[in-house]
């Protein structure tokens, strides 16, 4: 099945502690999850690695969030939208369900 949410898409969080926040997708994992910039931040306790000159401490980083909790953001309508597919010039393209506009 084709991916409805891809890397570099702007998405909005539908549920959870970050509900309503927007961010750019950094990575989509094969487990049906995505990592979004600035969303679902966790604190990781990291040990120092002297060989790589890396200090230890508490590091904030993005955790994966399930794709079902994300919706693609339609900038033209300024709201969350669903994704559909359409064949254009023999190629399958993603479109917004609300207005039929092609997603870049």
Swiss-Prot record:
Keyword match Ribosomal protein: yes
Cited InterPro entries: KOW, Rib_uL2_dom2, Ribosomal_uL24, Ribosomal_uL24_CS, Ribosomal_uL24_KOW, Translation_prot_SH3-like_sf
Protein origin, superkingdom: Bacteria
SUPFAM superfamilies in UniProt: Translation proteins SH3-like domain
Pfam families: KOW, ribosomal_L24
Keyword set includes Cytoplasm: no
Gene3D superfamilies reported for this sequence: 2.30.30.30
Example GO biological process: translation
Alphabetical keyword list: Ribonucleoprotein, Ribosomal protein, RNA-binding, rRNA-binding
GO cellular component terms given for this protein: ribonucleoprotein complex; ribosome
UniProt GO molecular function: rRNA binding; structural constituent of ribosome
Transmembrane segments: none
PROSITE patterns: RIBOSOMAL_L24 (PS01108)
Family: Belongs to the universal ribosomal protein uL24 family.
Function of the protein: One of two assembly initiator proteins, it binds directly to the 5'-end of the 23S rRNA, where it nucleates assembly of the 50S subunit. One of the proteins that surrounds the polypeptide exit tunnel on the outside of the subunit.
Subunit comment: Part of the 50S ribosomal subunit.
Protein's recorded name: Large ribosomal subunit protein uL24
Organism lineage: Bacteria, Pseudomonadati, Pseudomonadota, Gammaproteobacteria, Enterobacterales
């Amino acid at each position: 099945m084709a991916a409805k949410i891809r890397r570099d898409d702007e998405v909005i969080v539908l549920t959870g502690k970050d509900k309503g926040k927007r961010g750019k997708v950094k990575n989509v994992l094969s487990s049906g999850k995505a990592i979004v910039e600035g969303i679902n931040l966790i604190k990781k306790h990291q040990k120092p690695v002297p060989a790589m000159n890396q200090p230890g401490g508490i590091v904030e980083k993005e955790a994966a969030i399930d794709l079902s909790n994300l919706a693609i953001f339609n900038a033209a309508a300024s709201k969350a939208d669903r994704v559909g597919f359409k064949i254009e010039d023999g190629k399958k393209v993603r479109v917004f369900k609300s207005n039929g506009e092609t997603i870049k």
